[in-house]
Amino acid sequence: MTMTRLFITDVTLRDGMHAIGHRYDRGQVREIAAALDEAGVDAIEVGHGDGLNGSSLAYGFSRHSDLSYIHEAASVTRRAKLACVLLPGIGTIEDLKRARDSGIELVRIATHCTEADVSAQHISAAVELGFHVSGFLMMSSATTPENIGVQAAKMESYGAQCVYIADSAGNLTPAGTTARFQALEAALDGATQRGIHAHENLSLSVANTVVAVENGARRVDAALAGMGAGAGNCPIEAFIAVANKYGWEHGCELFKLQDAAEDLVRPLQDRPVRVDRQTLTLGYAGVYSSFLRHAERAANEFDIDVREIILEIGRRELIGGQEDMIIDVALDLAAHQSAQSPNRTG
């Protein structure tokens, strides 16, 4: 297969924030960023799991500010570019300016997969500020491939130089991934790049990333030991091993990625980042991966099987930004459970 070199973005220091409650310390950020830079990744994404300015009661407070994390990563990177995510309505154009001044060169403007229109102002502003700008269609499994093409074309028209399919729920199959990249091929100009951001909830992140590359993706998101929301992202060390077997060109060193994953990242996981009964249910139900910790807390508080909460979230089609409604789901399920209990007294 003849193709251009893959551009690998590691998201351990952004999506990986979800896996540890946004609690990296400064030293961990320096260590991980330095190891990634040494291992040859093209870009390192840094910041709160929900993007610039995401630290809040609703999404979870970071141990340190986004700018602090960016400064730490910038202090040790010599080759890799630094990247961030911004969700309109959470991050602002002023946040973009501060991120640029702190060393960020690439920004991904992320919206729900049916709401690309809300990215117009932020994409155009980011282009004017000199960033390489990507549109990021979150929860791409939650709409049709045809609509993905429509939404991607909107982002392109606002100035995005790349559009990512983000399988935030880890719900896509290889066939579903193929269909969405075929839709991008039909909708986008040939000069607009395509990217893939996969999650592991159905154990398909590497397979879906491979299929995406075979269908035109040249920008690939992955994380050390899969560090990310839910069952995690596409594990970078596994994907690079597969890319080597395919003969695809990239700049990464496999053993250095393996060492960073095992020595630096896995020891930080207070909850193993893996496919288990909870994270598998996220993928099965098509639920936003970063809802996992919120659902687990609600399940503990109300003594409900977290899988029931996740399934109900899926039925209600909650999307990112509706984390506060998870408690409502748990309350409703607890009330129903109480009403069905044979030991109920009154």
UniProtKB/Swiss-Prot annotation:
InterPro entries: 2-IPM_HCS-like, 4OH_2_O-val_aldolase, Aldolase_TIM, DmpG_comm, DRE_TIM_HOA, PYR_CT. Mn(2+) binds at D15, H197, H199. The keyword ATP-binding does not apply. Its EC number is 4.1.3.39. Gene3D superfamilies: 1.10.8.60, Aldolase class I (3.20.20.70). Disulfide bonds: none annotated. The active site is at H18. Substrate binds at R14, D15, S168, H197, Y288. One of its GO terms (biological process) is L-leucine biosynthetic process. The record marks R14 as: Transition state stabilizer. Residues 6-258 form the Pyruvate carboxyltransferase domain. Keywords: Aromatic hydrocarbons catabolism, Lyase, Manganese, Metal-binding. Pfam families: DmpG_comm, HMGL-like. It catalyses: (S)-4-hydroxy-2-oxopentanoate = acetaldehyde + pyruvate. It comes from the Bacteria. Transmembrane segments: none annotated. CDD domains: DRE_TIM_HOA. The keyword Metal-binding applies. Belongs to the 4-hydroxy-2-oxovalerate aldolase family. This is 4-hydroxy-2-oxovalerate aldolase 1. It comes from Mycolicibacterium smegmatis (strain ATCC 700084 / mc(2)155) (Mycobacterium smegmatis).
